């Protein structure tokens, strides 16, 4: 089981779809060697050093957290059913209302659209909020996503810089 890493007063909570088998096997988020999450958040400015999956709890040292829509592990995220995403979206709203991070970063357009019953999502900051929490849609860092690492870093850096401008 991959546990959430959450606390109050975080700058950002990154929300994945569900754990892959590598994460489920280790208990750490974004554990597959091809997943670029840890590299990207470091290069984008969220962490002072590149953490390893087994150091995930140290995200809190940088006022970052992680969660997911669905707890059930799968080989690929496309194995998650729409109803699981919708149910996960309701639970995610409750978590965000409780912890109130400055921003929630949903990793993937389809995840945002399915989890929150939205259509036509664009990358970046959304008009939808959860209380005072901004919602951002960022590309998923999975190794299965063909987007170049540089483009991932650019998208994530936009969020980091926006939070800095907001004094966070």
From Swiss-Prot:
Signal peptide: none
Assigned keywords, A-Z: Cytoplasm, DNA damage, DNA excision, DNA repair, DNA-binding, Hydrolase
Known EC number: 3.2.2.28
Principal cellular location given in the protein's record: cytoplasm
SUPFAM superfamilies named in the record: Uracil-DNA glycosylase-like
UniProt-listed Pfam families: UDG
Example of a GO cellular component annotation carried by this entry: cytoplasm
GO biological process: base-excision repair, AP site formation
Subcellular location: Cytoplasm
Major enzyme class: hydrolase
Keyword DNA-binding recorded: yes
GO molecular function: DNA binding; pyrimidine-specific mismatch base pair DNA N-glycosylase activity; uracil DNA N-glycosylase activity
Catalysed reactions listed for this entry: Specifically hydrolyzes mismatched double-stranded DNA and polynucleotides, releasing free uracil
Keyword Cytoplasm among UniProt keywords: yes
Chain's role: Excises ethenocytosine and uracil, which can arise by alkylation or deamination of cytosine, respectively, from the corresponding mispairs with guanine in ds-DNA. It is capable of hydrolyzing the carbon-nitrogen bond between the sugar-phosphate backbone of the DNA and the mispaired base. The complementary strand guanine functions in substrate recognition. Required for DNA damage lesion repair in stationary-phase cells.
Family: Belongs to the uracil-DNA glycosylase (UDG) superfamily. TDG/mug family.
NCBIfam families found in the cross-reference section: PRK10201.1
Assembly mode: Binds DNA as a monomer.
Protein name: G/U mismatch-specific DNA glycosylase
Gene: mug
């Amino acid at each position: 089981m991959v546990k959430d890493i959450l606390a109050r007063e975080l700058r950002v909570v990154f929300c994945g779809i569900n754990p892959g088998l590598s994460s489920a096997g280790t208990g750490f988020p974004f554990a597959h060697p091809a997943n670029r999450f840890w590299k990207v958040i470091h290069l984008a400015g969220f962490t002072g050093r590149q953490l390893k999956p087994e150091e995930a709890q140290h995200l809190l040292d940088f006022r970052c957290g992680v969660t997911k829509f669905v707890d059930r592990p799968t080989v690929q995220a496309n194995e998650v059913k729409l109803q699981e995403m919708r149910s996960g979206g309701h639970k995610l709203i409750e978590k965000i209302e409780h912890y109130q991070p400055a921003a929630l970063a949903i990793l993937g357009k389809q995840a945002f659209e399915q989890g929150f019953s939205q259509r036509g999502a664009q990358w970046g900051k959304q008009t939808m909020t959860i209380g005072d929490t901004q919602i951002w849609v960022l590309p998923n860092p999975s190794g299965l996503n063909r987007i170049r690492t540089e483009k991932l870093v650019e998208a994530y850096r936009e969020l980091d810089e926006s939070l800095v401008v907001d004094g966070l």
